[in-house]
From Swiss-Prot:
Sequence segments annotated as region (Disordered): 1-27, 178-206
Coiled-coil regions listed: 25-55, 121-153
Name of the protein: Charged multivesicular body protein 5
Assembly and interaction partners: Probable peripherally associated component of the endosomal sorting required for transport complex III (ESCRT-III).
Any matching Pfam family: Snf7
BP GO annotations: late endosome to vacuole transport via multivesicular body sorting pathway; protein transport; vesicle budding from membrane
Position of the signal peptide: none
Gene3D superfamilies according to UniProt: 6.10.250.1710, ESAT-6-like
Similarity comment: family membership: Belongs to the SNF7 family.
Record has Lyase as a keyword: no
Species, as recorded: Danio rerio
Cross-referenced InterPro entries: Snf7_fam (IPR005024)
């Protein structure tokens, strides 16, 4: 049968919006180039008419410029249509891509919810509470062991009378520490001799004193 009727042409991949957008944009660029060439031609006719006087020759150039302008307006309309088509397809393509992303997100969330359910099935609150109770009991036992190990032996009993006596004794010691009279006595002691033996000096009262600051007895 294939020999008689021949084989059908293999079907190509279906068109997608991205390829369509590229094709439309390429056509719009081609139209822009044509418009640019027509603009250059209009400028040429403009320069010619500036140099010409009114008459049949100038009117002929003006008619050519009118035909070029009509072509330009036609191409501009085509370009605007192509640009609008491209914009519409881009919006549609964006919407489709957004929907695909949303679908992927929803599927991922569903998979995550299933995994969470499976994980929670293996978690039992009663077992966790029992484990917490066991840990609390073990901590209490450990504290009791520490208290037993830190117990002191042979410590004398202390009553309130012993405490008051100790505090009174501490107060007396503090008073003794605050008594600085011995410092005054030390400061009033004779100073170290400064002069050489035999030097004659006087104190503040004008009395002769020796090198130790002691009054000298006059020789008789």
């Amino acid at each position: 049968m294939n020999r008689i009727f021949g084989r059908g042409k293999p079907k190509g991949p279906p068109p997608n919006l991205t390829d369509c957008i590229s094709g439309v944009d390429s056509r719009a660029e081609s139209v822009d180039k044509k418009i640019a060439r027509l603009d250059a031609e209009l400028m040429k006719y403009k320069d010619q008419m500036k140099k010409m006087r009114d008459g049949p020759s100038k009117n002929m150039v003006k008619q050519k410029a009118m035909r070029v302008l009509k072509q330009k307006r036609m191409y501009e309309g085509q370009r605007d249509q192509l640009m609008q088509q491209s914009f519409n397809m881009e919006q549609a393509n964006y919407t489709i891509q957004t929907l695909k992303d949303t679908k992927t997100t929803v599927e991922a969330m569903k998979i995550g919810a299933k995994e969470m359910k499976k994980a929670y099935k293996n978690v039992k609150i009663d077992q966790i509470e029992d484990l917490q109770d066991q840990l609390e009991d073990m901590m209490e036992d450990a504290n009791e062991v520490q208290e037993a190990l830190s117990r002191s032996y042979g410590t004398p009993e202390i009553d309130e009378d012993d405490l008051e006596a100790e505090l009174d004794a501490l107060g007396d010691e503090l008073l003794l520490d605050d008594d600085n009279s011995y410092l005054d006595e030390a400061s009033s002691a004779p100073a170290i001799p400064e002069g050489a033996p035999g030097d004659r000096t006087t104190n503040r009262d004008g009395v002769l004193v020796d090198e130790f600051g002691l009054p000298q007895i006059p020789a008789t």
